[in-house]
Amino acid sequence: VSQDRRTAIVTGSARGIGAAVAQRLASDGHAVAVLDLDESACAGTVDAITSAGGEALAVGANVADEASVTAAVERVASELGAPTILINNAGITRDNLLFKMSVDDWDAVMNVHLRGAFLMSRAVQKYMVDAKFGRIVNLSSTSALGNRGQANYSAAKAGMQGFTKTLAFELGKFGVTANAIAPGFIETEMTAATAERVGMSFEDFKAAAASQIPVARVGQPEDIAHTASFFASEGAGFVSGQVVYVAGGPKD
């Protein structure tokens, strides 16, 4: 499907789901700002895009810091073009049971996920409104429905869904849609670290997860990228305020 070349920003795209989304949007014909906390860590994703003939820019920014976000978005606008696709993917985990969870554990997760999505969305919306076109895709999680040891993460990921629906109401009349993707178990460095923390080999951890998933496999970053590509497309202009669980079966 041919569509206009847009400028996309994908936060947390040095690796994992974000990297897959950035590469997919580039293959869709968009210029992609590969944004992560450490600019040098973005090199792998940028190289993958440019070696495939795409256009990408590495951008180092802390999504939880207002000045950092403002500077990053202005840099993208000047070097790649006005951003009209935003994927709020940056995320961290600081898992612990409630009685062991520190205030720092809580704040760190809230800041990256929710404050980050707020600051990024607020910074790019003016470019979208000017273009009369915008696509915001927020990464939620099946953990939004509750997950032991993730009071902070599940609250943040549920918050992303409410934030998404409000953006849909506020920005719809300007040609801007906002949707959320809630991944289930996806094979990434983050889930590998979870396996290590609970004392399982990653292969056993994945097998246990797959046994509970109707399609009988764990997800890949590309599964999320496929859905993000759809939400970012021109053809998805009548889809807004939705949460899609990309989890191999029904979740909500």
PLM region spans:
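Substrate-binding pocket helix/loop in short-chain dehydrogenase/reductase
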Residues: 97-98, 105-107, 136, 205, ...
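Alpha-helical segment proximal to the catalytic Tyr-Lys
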Residues: 126, 169-173, 237
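Short C-terminal tail/terminal secondary-structure segment
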Residues: 2, 229, 240-252
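Active-site helix of classical SDR
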Residues: 121, 156, 164
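Active-site loop-to-helix junction immediately N-terminal to the catalytic Tyr of the SDR YXXXK motif
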Residues: 101, 146-155, 166
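Short, small/polar-rich loop/turn modules that mediate ligand/substrate recognition or access, typified
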Residues: 82, 172, 177, 239-241
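Active-site Tyr-X3-Lys motif and surrounding loop/helix of classical short-chain dehydrogenase/reductase
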Residues: 71-78, 96-100, 104-111, 150
